Swiss-Prot record:
InterPro entries membership: Cyclophilin-like_dom_sf, Cyclophilin-type_PPIase_dom
EC number: 5.2.1.8
Enzyme class: isomerase
Protein name: Peptidyl-prolyl cis-trans isomerase CPR4
Subcellular location: Membrane
Amino acid sequence: MWLKSLLLCLYSLVLCQVHAAPSSGKQITSKDVDLQKKYEPSPPATHRGIITIEYFDPVSKSMKEADLTFELYGTVVPKTVNNFAMLAHGVKAVIEGKDPNDIHTYSYRKTKINKVYPNKYIQGGVVAPDVGPFTVYGPKFDDENFYLKHDRPERLAMAYFGPDSNTSEFIITTKADGNEELDGKSVVFGQITSGLDQLMDAIQYTETDEYGKPQHELRFLYFVLEILKISNILDLHAAYTEKVEKFRNGDVSVGSTLENIFRNDKAYTPLTTSTGTTAYDLNHPISRALMCLTVLGLCFIAYKGMHEKPHTVSLRHK
């Protein structure tokens, strides 16, 4: 009887594991980005830098780091870029209503990535979790403009909490064909220019709960930022806006592509494949289901063996 009960329990477990396994639908990765597609020209960069993201690798069961280079567009959204750049460097501040000698440094360094939505964006950058919304202008600041569009992957943009409600939080988009649904809501202020494969192939598929909260440590570890000193920046911006108007009027010849953005890193092995989630992780639901099936099969063999009638062979001598 105990074997029958065990078999029933294992059968139920197998059903649960198979039901919990992800579908075999194709995941969107860096390979799905059309590198030849023409986009609006990019503004002249006023800042360049590197963001280091620390994330949990489910294959090696260890923490890894990904370096993403980026550029900021201060000629288009100077106020938004200034807020991001200052928090990347770190600012000293005294919170209103508290001891004026109680000075704290607030920066993006080691802040958590608190939301991850595959094929949409990752979001983080809460610099003062014990205080509340924080910017270099006060708790919040208004939307500057929506001139730059979410027309391509890896846009740097402000996290959306409603009109004119920008805080320190920002997003990095991961949708292969752009997040046009965010146009007119989230202010774009920059672009990731390398490290896109790690972001799109691994980081955006980190394990989360039903609300998009990462199940393992995921954070912006370091920021390195450089202000570019360009003497003719105003002339470059004027030439840029002229090209944008031509592009929006149908002249795609002035557009730019993403062909040179993706870096060629042969040492990096993506965690996902073109057919879906990898299943060689022992904690993966499919792997657990296969192990359950194996145990189920062994139990069945044992059960069958115990109930088979023995075959008696006579060894008597005549």
